[in-house]
């Protein structure tokens, strides 16, 4: 069993979520100003070098908007911090990834891009299905202020 298997809340809700994501036909599409603006706003709020709008499918997280990770458009789901974030309704903040037992041996922490900090807010549809995240990343440990976390949640 991999990390991905441990974070899926239930097979039926995950199947419903994946079906809705496919129906939206947004994964693997071209950049759009709206999503780029969401990532830029998240970056400005948090003051981080990296901001993403991430969509999580069955095998990967794919970035609809990407600031700070040039040349990369996805990562395997089993490495995705966002796969954890979509399990809840609130912002997930990881203040020091190497010290967090969920992520200390994650290749995104131990290798490039060297994630130390992550905060992500789930993108939740009106019916409660979570499609992905608006997230920010830094290569240094830190903490956002409550108002910044709330603003990130509102963006999502």
For each feature predicted by the language model, list its residue ranges.
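Amphipathic alpha-helical "output/dimerization" segments
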Residues: 144-156
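Short beta-strand-to-loop transition segments that serve as allosteric relay/switch motifs
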Residues: 133-142
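Amphipathic alpha-helical regulatory segments at dimerization interfaces
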Residues: 24, 36-45, 84-88, 109
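Glycine-rich acetyl-CoA-binding "A-motif" of GNAT/NAT acetyltransferases
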Residues: 130
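Signal-transmission linkers at sensory-effector interfaces
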Residues: 1-33
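Regulatory sensory and allosteric helical modules in signal-transduction proteins
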Residues: 20, 49-50, 56, 60-64, ...
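A short, aliphatic-rich beta-strand micro-motif
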Residues: 116-127
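Helix-loop-beta substructure at the N-terminus of cytosolic sensory domains
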Residues: 28-61
């Amino acid at each position: 069993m991999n990390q991905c298997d441990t974070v899926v809340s239930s097979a039926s809700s995950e199947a419903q979520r994946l079906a809705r994501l496919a129906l939206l036909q947004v994964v693997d599409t071209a950049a759009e100003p709206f999503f780029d603006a969401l990532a830029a706003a998240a970056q400005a709020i948090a003051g981080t070098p990296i901001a993403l709008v991430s969509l999580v499918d069955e095998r990967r997280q794919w970035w609809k908007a990407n600031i700070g990770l040039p040349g990369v458009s996805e990562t395997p789901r089993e490495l995705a911090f966002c796969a954890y974030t979509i399990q809840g309704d609130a912002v997930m903040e990881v203040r020091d990834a190497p010290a967090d037992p969920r992520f200390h041996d994650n290749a995104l922490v131990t290798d490039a891009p060297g994630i130390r900090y992550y905060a992500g807010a789930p993108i939740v549809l009106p019916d409660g299905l979570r499609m992905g995240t608006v997230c920010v990343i830094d290569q240094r440990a830190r903490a956002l202020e409550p108002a910044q976390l709330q603003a990130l949640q509102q963006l999502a």
